[in-house]
Amino acid sequence: VTKPALSERELMDFEKAGKLEAFNTDGLRSLIYTMGHIPDMKEKTLRYPGHVDLIIALQQAGFFDSAPIQVNDTTLSPLDFTSKLLVSEWKLGETEEEFTVMKVIVKGEGKTITYDLYDQYDPLTQTSSMARTTGYTCTAAVNLITKGMFTEKGVFPPELIGDRKECFDFVLEYLKDRRVHWAKTSG
């Protein structure tokens, strides 16, 4: 079953980030093929409450249309105009503080395991949280290869690398060494 982006909105409370709005987004497409044994999966994006309403308002008003329109003596697409305005406004400043929050919930065989991540801008290294959580994960993967822990050839999605316990544990330890912490709870 495929659900449209921005659908199935729900509010979620996070200890450090507060109340956030979760909604369906399009991503992790490789999971459909690599984790076919899992009957139900969802991926949701988290934003501050009200984000979806603003995006829907822009969409319904035509700001994401790609067909060019005439404005005075200029022809341009609403999407190009919107992108030009919003991308510069949304671009993170060099030392602007931000955070990353993630929750992974795995349910099956009568138990639930939850992984929670909260990370924020590191003023000591002047490294954004997004760089810390994604970049360090990529460099951990490079280290897996250089240390001979992952020797497969070709392109591999992250879930196939993480499917190996020694690789999964290595990545989590690598992140921990850089003060990126996951909390695991079981229930």
Task: Give residue ranges: language-model regions.
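C-terminal catalytic/substrate-binding lobe primarily of soluble NAD(P)-dependent oxidoreductases
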Residues: 1-187
